[in-house]
Amino acid sequence: EHHSNIVPWQLLCERTGAVLKVVPFTDAGELILEEYERLLASGRVKLVAVVHLSNALGTINPIKLMIELAHARNIPVLVDGAQSIPHLAVDVRALDCEFYAFSSHKIYGPSGVGVLYGKKALLEAMPPYQGGGDMIRLVTFEETEYADLPNKFEAGTPSIAGVIGLGAALDWLSAIGLDAVAAQEHELLEYATAQLREIPGLNIMGTARDKAALVAFTMQGIHPHDIGTILDREGVAIRAGHHCAQPIMQRYGVPATARASFAAYNTRDEVDALVKALWKVKELFEL
């Protein structure tokens, strides 16, 4: 899980006394569903919050099955779709999740904007989380009558330009087609994985059977930040660090990883440039 699907729940637990339980995962980066079912069977689970696609490993979690298992016990499910939304075709009705959230900047839109999908009955039952203008129908000094959905959750002046920018990004990606994007990225992932495995001392983190869009790795004796710096000088942009997923780093016993993420615009030539630059990293460290 990304920190954004951990820290808010920890804050909630501090306020309410609730207990946060975690489903463990295998060395390959796959959730252990038997442990998930065991937690559900405890009878104490109030909400399942799970990432659709791991931003640190690329694992695609079996969301549909997890939702069905939770619903069999009348447990609602919130899906963190920030990483999956630009890489997979998502149908929230088919998934039948109660909530699905994603951020604009992950789908080529402006920063500071996001989307929370929720089932209408649940949203109507929920109180506003903040107050301000435009989220009201009637205000007196004695009470406030809130506006209908979705306005009651949108206090104050919204990010008008950001929302328009997000709409343009969604239109652009929809015109290409997410199925086409997924196929392109899968081909790049397969190609890159095969090339990276040829580099001695390079260890790929996360080898789930169902995976998309990215490859995270370490190189023996070389800090990921050094990898990122050298690649930057070679004109190759990757991400190096804990990727806002420190529990995953702790699970693998590493401080950080280097991560190459693929998008709709990437090509095989760029994968070749990445691999060539990684060989140069090895040369510089004389490994």
Protein language model annotation of sequence segments:
Residues 1-287:
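Pyridoxal 5′-phosphate
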